[in-house]
Amino acid sequence: SIKEFFSSSQLSQFMDQVNPLAELEHKRRLSAMGPGGLTRERAGFEVRDVHHSHYGRICPIETPEGPNIGLVGHLATYARVNEYGFLETPYLIVKKAVTADAKELEHRILAEAVAGIKAGTKLDADQAAKVAKEMKGQMVKVKPFVTLEIDYLNAIVEDRKVMAHAGILLDEHRNMTEPMVEARVKGHPETIEAELIDYVDVSVKQCISIATALIPFLEHDDANRALMGSNMQRQAVSCVVPEAPIIGTGIEDKAARDSGQVVLAVEGGEVIEADAEHVVIRSKAPAGAKKEYIDREYPLQSF
């Protein structure tokens, strides 16, 4: 009867809990079918195909192999749904000018001669102070650099901007070092002047889903095989004694934590009791407490 309740709507499903990844990815699944949507029979190739607006929002790889191919998708790693129901993806803002402030100007490369300092000079603290004094309250043109500010963009806004990928060359202060960079202009790949870049990808795994990001050396795989790999990872039965993989991509820890199937301790301590139902961890009490230590009990998920 529980199963019946969950299948009362076409878009409601009983949660897939084969392993932590299956649960996480099931919660991030997207469908073009259901009430007000398409039907398998009516959907042609056009609808199922990967579109440039999917970048950073819907994974181009993880989709079922059967009749649902391209109709059921998965959220990309950093994508989010905004208050209006649109998918957004984050980008780092690129700046080409800064306010005449010594702190802001330090380590920036001048785009034009200012205060007797030649264009192309990387400013040190003294030079930055000199320029700041000369240009007080004005904007100083610098070579493009990637800030740590993030903007979430939907596909419509992104289409009007010029986006560079996360693999572009930057120096240790995030200045762009190449005069020409590979970028997406209106969704199409081009090589363009660095000065024209508006945003840079947050990460190289921005356009793919969590399951796909778990595949090591994904860039060497054929797309069809990567699709099979992403889908089959969700079907793997968990080990009784789990081990860390010898080769990983670095996202394993985050995926496991966010799946909701892992019991996390509030703080480190000594395990003083453990069985199939619970774990008790003893940690130092905070300063000023009456007790010397605190025992915290964590119930385990047991079936």
Description of each model-found segment:
Residues S1-F303:
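Intrinsically disordered, low-complexity regulatory segments
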